[in-house]
Amino acid sequence: MRRLLSSAALTLSFLAGQSADAASNDALLGDFFPYRDFQTLPSTRIDVEGGALEVAFAPGNLELPKATILEWVSRSARAVANYFGRLPDAQAKLLIVPVEGRGVRGGTTYGTRGAASRIVFGRATTEDQLTRDWILVHELVHHGFPNVGSQHHWLEEGLATYVEPIARAQAGELSAQMVWRDLVRGLPKGLPQAGDQGLDHTPTWGRIYWGGALFYLLADIEIRRHTENRRGLQHALRAIVSAGGSIARDWPVEKVLATGDAGTETRVLQDLYRKMKAAPGDVDLADLWRQLGVSMDGGSVSFDESAPLAEIRRAITAVAR
């Protein structure tokens, strides 16, 4: 199944009026991952805990040295492997396709013949832009969750939206303040609107990405409450990966949630899913931030370490034991 970022649908438009190299990349930017063509491209193997990521570049010039780009890929892959306890797919693939412009322009992840991600990469991208990029980690997080079908797409995209900044924070690439700032800004977009029928039945952009992320934040908090903060969502996801779950596998949603719950010895994922799948499940975010001890003034986040859930908040971005 194809996984798209909101910006990824724009990637084909970059081909219009491009050079011969860009035109030759048509087949590499289609609706499916070019598994066969990928094998014909020069590639580099990046070894990561639990496997390796094979990285190939489509034809086209890039201003940054490939060694710099590969170091960015390596950092991103290590952040994801650290979060899941290992690389979710031991033989994952990454295709980098140059286009005009700057920055990482979009990403797509597939599981048809193994976990594979494609990144659309501006030729004039700077090293600073790579340092601040979130898209590659978002795509690689998708590798660690089974394909559960279009009705449950919010479980897939919500997971990548929630886990990406936390994985980067645990790897030392992002501050805890930035993680919570983005959640405070983003989660209101995932709240139910008039006519909402629950996450399984309201496939809007806000509900798929940020409604899904809210589900996982609530699950993370509840798992930690049930286990006296010894375990969290991260342990549930590691259990799914340890059981063979990845984007290259089709699993019923019931199996995914039950496997995750087994990893925390709770029923939080299954119970929360039943609560939110077919009903709006509105959440008082202002009260949630108060309990977590998170407040934002302008663009700056501060923490109240005496808040009821401050210890849980700290544990979410700390390296898992």
Task: Go through the PLM ranges and name each one.
Residues 23-47, 75:
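Structured beta-strand-rich cores of soluble
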Residues 18-21:
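Sec/Tat signal peptide C-region and signal peptidase I cleavage site
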Residues 1-4:
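Positively charged n-region of N-terminal signal peptides that target proteins for export
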Residues 151-220, 225-227, 233, 242-247:
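Acidic/His/Gly-enriched intrinsically disordered linker/tail segments
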Residues 7-16:
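Bacterial N-terminal signal peptides
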Residues 63-75, 126-131, 135, 150, ...:
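Soluble non-cytosolic domains of exported or imported proteins
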Residues 246-321:
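Beta/coil-rich, acidic/histidine-enriched accessory regions frequently appended to metallopeptidases
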Residues 45-148, 152:
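Juxtacatalytic substrate-recognition/specificity segment
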